[in-house]
């Protein structure tokens, strides 16, 4: 976009022309702001889609773009298409819990989910009622056929966090491309 100069003389028609040029410039900036947030949000969505691990079929990413008088705002949304029903056997019978694929992808569970990126304020993901989440030895569980399995938990793939990092990394580059 570069610098724009508006020349004005002290006449009614010159002032009117300057106002028209300013309004046109305002629309141009608004359009560029929309392009900017659209491109950044697309980078975020593509990054998030590439970091969902085995939960990809349960998570849909989209964006909402809201142009307003102050510029433009974009929000990236991660929506679940459903819950995963996890079932296992215990001495008391079959247990079941609905698991959020979105939370599992973002935060993981168990010992493997100890905030691998050291994101401030993010704790270790756990299953509801988990007793062994912080046990470095992991835990054992029986499937519905009675077979014993060992687990350390689910490693988080952090799709939304990685989307944020990628957008931050590209913010200046995209701004230069869009605004010049």
Q: Residue locations for each model-derived region?
A:
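"Short basic amphipathic alpha-helical interaction patches in structured regions
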Residues: 91-95
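Mid-chain, well-packed structural core segment of small domains
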Residues: 84-88
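Short, Lys/Arg-rich flexible segments
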Residues: 1-83, 112-180
């Amino acid at each position: 976009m570069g610098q724009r100069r508006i020349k004005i003389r002290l006449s009614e028609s010159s002032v009117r022309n300057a106002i028209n040029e300013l309004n046109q410039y305002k629309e141009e900036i608004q359009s560029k702001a929309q392009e900017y947030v659209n491109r950044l949000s697309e980078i975020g969505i593509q990054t998030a889609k590439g970091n969902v691990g085995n939960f990809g079929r349960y998570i849909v990413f989209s964006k909402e773009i809201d142009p307003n008088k102050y510029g433009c705002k974009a929000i990236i949304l991660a929506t679940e298409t459903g819950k995963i029903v996890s079932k296992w056997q215990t001495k008391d019978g079959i247990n079941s819990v609905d698991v959020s694929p979105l939370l599992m992808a973002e935060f993981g569970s168990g010992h493997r989910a100890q905030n691998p990126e050291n994101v401030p304020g993010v704790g270790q993901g756990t299953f509801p009622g988990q007793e062994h989440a912080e046990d470095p030895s992991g835990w054992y569980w029986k499937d519905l056929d009675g077979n014993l399995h060992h687990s350390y938990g689910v490693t988080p793939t952090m799709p939304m966090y990685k989307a944020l990092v990628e957008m931050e990394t590209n913010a200046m580059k995209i701004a230069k491309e869009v605004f010049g």
